[in-house]
């Protein structure tokens, strides 16, 4: 079974369920009860019905309507930047490092939207953002 790790667990649940939905044909999906399929999928991985996924199969349609579909992934992109920036503090050996905190404030926060956000991030990190810190935070890096 998958242990709870907060929000990271939520993403794992959704990913596992998504993989199960994509492992069947459209014809098979039309014959299924979506709620029952979801319940059986989550049980297969040792996940309880009482701990609901963030979005249930039957009401996640909002991502496919209007302009929200591309905007939804901006949350994931923000999480990439967040985890990578926090990784700088872990690399410094002190998440309360005053010098690094000042650099973050000076290179990103104080600039606001006066410069391109990715340029600001590169100014802080010295490179473009990478996804590895996010994968680690969400338990998707294969280390556990």
Map each language-model feature to its residues.
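Single conserved hydrophobic/aromatic residue that forms the stacking wall/gate
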Residues: 1-11
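Hydrophobic alpha-helix position signal
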Residues: 2, 41-42, 89, 122, ...
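Hydrophobic alpha-helical scaffolding
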Residues: 4-5, 27-31, 50, 67-71, ...
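C-terminal substrate/ligand-recognition segments
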Residues: 9-24, 48, 53, 60-87, ...
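Long hydrophobic segments that form regular secondary structure
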Residues: 17-44, 48
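A generic secondary-structure signal for well-formed alpha-helical elements
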Residues: 21-24, 45-49, 80, 84-93, ...
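Active/binding-pocket-proximal capping segment
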Residues: 31-41, 54-58, 79-83, 91-105
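C-terminal amphipathic alpha-helical interaction region
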Residues: 94-142
């Amino acid at each position: 079974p998958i242990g709870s790790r907060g929000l990271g667990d939520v993403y794992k649940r959704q990913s596992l369920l998504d993989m199960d939905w994509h492992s069947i044909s459209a014809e098979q999906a039309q014959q299924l009860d979506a709620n029952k399929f979801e319940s059986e999928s989550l049980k297969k991985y040792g996940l309880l019905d009482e701990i609901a996924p963030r979005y249930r199969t039957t009401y996640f349609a909002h991502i496919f309507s209007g302009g929200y579909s591309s905007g939804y992934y901006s949350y994931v992109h923000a999480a990439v930047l967040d985890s990578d920036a926090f990784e700088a503090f872990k690399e410094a050996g002190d998440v309360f490092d005053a010098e690094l905190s000042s650099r973050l404030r000076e290179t990103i926060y104080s600039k606001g939207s006066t410069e391109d956000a990715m340029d600001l991030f590169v100014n802080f990190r010295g490179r473009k953002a990478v996804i590895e810190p996010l994968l680690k935070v969400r338990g998707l890096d294969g280390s556990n």
